[in-house]
Design a protein with these regions (language model features):
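A short, Trp-centered hydrophobic/proline-enriched beta-strand micro-motif
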Residues: 119-127
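Internal helix-loop-helix
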Residues: 48-120, 160-167, 178
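Buried hydrophobic positions in well-ordered alpha/beta secondary-structure cores of metabolic enzymes
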Residues: 10, 21, 50, 57, ...
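Intrinsic disorder at enzyme termini
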Residues: 1-13, 143
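A short core secondary-structure module
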Residues: 149, 153-197
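Cytochrome P450 C-terminal beta-domain/meander region
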Residues: 135-153
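Glycine-rich phosphate/pyrophosphate-binding beta-alpha loops
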Residues: 132-133, 157-162, 205
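Flexible, small-/acidic-enriched active-site or ligand-binding loops
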Residues: 138, 190-215
Length: 215
């Protein structure tokens, strides 16, 4: 009996992803890793496949549907390339899409999502902090309101995709200690007072763009 979830659409999608990886990624993996970077157009080519568009409305450039089996297939096929650093960097937008699509205003979504879906711009999630790691309950970055604006003060580190990202979702403390006092902020890379620096000489995943962010 045929697996009812192994549909023709899923098979075609998997084959498309595999063909792309075999022709566009595998031949260059070692070269890009040694160089510590990859061509910007790879972001756009990967995004053209739709691999980050699951669960995102078509009006934002997404696929307009979700499929957990197709998501799994993407992960499996990407894993076969041994290009973990590359896909960590290209895929850094993926870990910010959840909070962005669920919590952001329509104005922010219309601004950022089409850019992220097309690969024209990158995005990252900023949670991990120097000295505290990813223990969200102990987050030290703070935000306070001045007039109609929020001002962030602190830093984040080991942020995947942080040097090339144009958009960030940043966690900051706005209330009491612990998990209950954390808010998320949409931050653009050209925001006054925001700077970043690259983390170099890593043990591996050299293609992965990794940064420390300062507010």
């Amino acid at each position: 009996m045929r697996n009812p979830y192994d549909t023709d659409d899923r098979k075609s999608f998997r084959e498309m992803v595999t063909k792309f990886l075999e022709t566009e990624i595998w031949p260059h993996v070692d070269e890009w890793d040694e160089a510590g970077q990859y061509p910007q157009e790879i972001n756009e080519k990967v995004c053209e496949l739709g691999v980050f568009g699951f669960g995102i409305d078509e009006k934002y450039g997404g696929l307009g549907f979700d499929d957990q089996f197709m998501r799994k297939d993407v992960s499996v096929e990407m894993g076969r390339t041994s290009a973990g650093g590359l896909f960590a960097s290209v895929g850094s937008r993926n870990i910010m899409l959840g909070p962005l699509t669920e919590l952001a205003s329509e104005e922010i979504k219309m601004k950022a999502l089409p850019d992220l879906m097309s690969g024209r711009k990158g995005g990252s999630l900023g949670i991990t902090e120097p000295g505290g790691g990813s223990d969200v309950a102990q987050m030290k970055t703070v935000a306070h309101k001045e007039g109609d604006e929020w001002v962030l003060n602190g830093s984040k580190t080991f942020i995947t995709g942080g040097m090339q990202a144009s958009y960030f979702v940043i966690g900051a403390r706005t209330g009491k200690e612990g998990l209950g006092g954390i808010s998320l902020f949409f931050v653009e890379a050209d925001t006054p007072g925001f700077t970043r620096s690259a983390i170099e000489k890593k043990m591996g995943w050299w293609t992965s763009d990794t940064a420390t962010l300062y507010f």
